[in-house]
């Protein structure tokens, strides 16, 4: 009895095969499913069922569970789209005051899915970190990832690089971000006035220098007593000056230097303005008159 039809059922689609007299086999050219087979089952394949029917209506069926042909009836389809990587912290050119920042990123793949074992981070020229050192939280289509360096990063510029691949072996385009660590506040030297200065001149000029090698430029403010903190111009060499008018009595001058990372240094100077001359209240010469060549005592009472 002759074979009537041979059909293949793959991923819910039935295709009738055509007899090839040359190869003496039933054949068909079929378009593979548009998605990866990785998540279809534990074996990561699409099962294929072959159904052969003869002219008498007898039917033979073979599928992926068949002891002899089962392994031949497993269609594995691999996608070609790589995962997407998004670094969420730190951002490019960020200034960070924490030298052990929690670096965060996301890896997603909407087909075969992200292979968590391929997720890695490299800091500067160090070794790539993978595995359990990275905290991976499952989200739709991938993972939210966090990594905190075990050793504090030095102040200055750093570059992180993130790698990943999907379950079909497609490697994502490496993503990188460069940022700066700044744990040290700016230097601040107030050269004038000296602390504790007593003067009879109301005009007072505050001068000094500031610097921050990691996160320039540095801004400087000067405040007199309870007044407003006023910004002053800082030169390319870090020098600054600010003219003030003192009030009579004790004056507190507060100078604050702040770098681009928000870290600040404060210097305070106390200056006293005294414009009242001392008063000579009494003078006594004892004895008076005094014998020539003898000593006498002069006593002066002065207040200020």
Regions found by a protein language model. Give the residues of each.
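Extracellular acidic loop/turn motifs
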Residues: 1-4, 109-116, 211-220, 304
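Short, surface-exposed loop motifs enriched in S/T, G, D/E and P with embedded aromatic residues
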Residues: 12-22, 32, 130-136, 229-236
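Aromatic sugar-binding surface patches on proteins
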Residues: 21-34, 137-147, 236-241
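Surface-exposed, short loops/turns at beta-strand junctions within beta-sandwich domains
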Residues: 32-45, 150-156, 243-250
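Flexible, low-complexity linkers/stalks enriched in Thr/Pro that connect modular domains
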Residues: 54, 66-86, 176-186, 269-278
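Short, solvent-exposed loop/linker segments at the N-terminal edge
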Residues: 93-99, 195-202, 288-294
